[in-house]
Design a protein with these regions (language model features):
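A short beta-sheet element
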Residues: 1-19, 34, 138-139, 150, ...
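A short glycine-rich beta-alpha junction/loop motif
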Residues: 1-2, 28-52, 122-125, 131, ...
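Extracellular/lumenal glycan-associated surfaces
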Residues: 52-64, 68-71, 107, 259-271, ...
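Extended intrinsically disordered, low-complexity coil regions enriched in Ser, Thr, Gly, Ala
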Residues: 65-80, 89-91, 272-287
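Charged, alpha-helix-forming regions
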Residues: 83, 89-100, 108
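Non-catalytic DNA-recognition/assembly elements of restriction-modification systems
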Residues: 98-121
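DNA target-recognition patches
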Residues: 125-156
Length: 295
């Protein structure tokens, strides 16, 4: 570990730190004596009073970023805990955490009883992508989002032979590098125009009334994910059978309780997104100020 210290005790440590951050110097090829090179850089030093002002500003920004990051992590941990506790564990008929007024036992229904499947895009080559009036849901959209992001789509030509997705459909990834990441699900709540599904996923269309927010979070709950992961097959890459997936039993309370759970978890997700955006906005602000306040 190498340390740089201030030779003038009146200089502000926070100002100095941010000024050094703005140098953007990266040691090359395990460079051993980079500290001596780093020490020779010249940085502009304003008056002591201005250093204090600038240092205090960045200290406040850093504190605010840290605060929102902690809130963000706290809410992510809360969501993870609720996804474990708001759905019945294997072999049980009621969850550990439940809204008041609901006492009925939950049902266990196979996915194959509740809906039907369809395939993603097929019969295409690389030249067919990147242009056209239709769009397709990307693999990363399905993998990353319990509720599909309507903006994470790519262009493709309209093709009547392909299966067009509908609002309320569920998408599942069929392959992954690890068993823990296979069979990730995403529910479509909105779309514009003609939209298809990428070829590395399959679609699922419920034929019974299910609250879509509940469906999105239930399919990513710990109890359901364990069942999906158990079906993963492979060595260097793991795959999951569409037919096997349809044999999985999932927990279903009354539609009223579904709506309550789905709405609550969706609101929590929105709060997580809000704090994530605040953190990103503050980080962009800090980066912009670093570029503008140091020469």
């Amino acid at each position: 570990m190498k340390l740089l210290t201030l030779t003038n005790e009146r200089d502000n440590i926070y100002f100095a730190f941010e000024a050094l951050q703005n140098l953007n110097y990266v040691p090359q090829n395990h460079e051993r004596h980079w500290i001596s090179i780093f020490s020779d850089f010249d940085i502009s030093i304003p008056s002591y009073g201005e250093q204090q002002k600038i240092g205090a500003l960045f200290k406040e920004i850093d504190s605010t970023i840290t605060l929102h990051q902690r809130k963000l992590e706290s809410m992510k941990l809360l969501k993870k805990s609720l996804l474990q506790k708001m759905f019945p564990k294997s072999g049980e008929t009621v969850p550990e955490v439940r809204f008041p007024g609901f006492t009925d036992a939950w049902e266990q229904r196979k996915l194959g009883e509740l809906g039907t499947t369809y395939t993603g895009i097929s019969g295409k080559t690389s030249s067919d992508f990147g242009h056209g009036d239709a769009r397709f849901i990307t693999y990363m959209n399905v993998y990353s989002n319990a509720i599909a992001n309507p903006l994470m789509v790519e262009p493709i030509e309209i093709d009547q032979k392909q299966n067009e997705v509908k609002v309320g459909d569920v998408f599942f990834t069929t392959s992954s590098e690890t068993p823990d990441e296979v069979g990730m699900s995403s529910v479509l709540l909105e779309k514009q125009g003609t939209v298809y599904l990428n070829s590395f996923c399959f679609g699922y269309r419920p034929k019974e009334k299910i609250d879509l927010h509940y469906l999105a979070f239930m399919l990513r709950s710990e109890v359901v994910r364990k069942k999906i992961i158990f079906l993963a097959q492979g060595i260097s890459r793991y795959n999951i059978s569409k037919n096997k997936m349809m044999e999985i039993s999932v927990p279903l309370p009354t539609i009223e309780e579904q709506s309550k759970i789905g709405g609550f978890l969706n609101n929590l997700d929105n709060l997580i997104t809000l704090h994530q955006r605040k953190v990103e906005a503050l980080q962009k602000l800090k980066k912009s100020l670093l570029q503008q306040m140091f020469v």
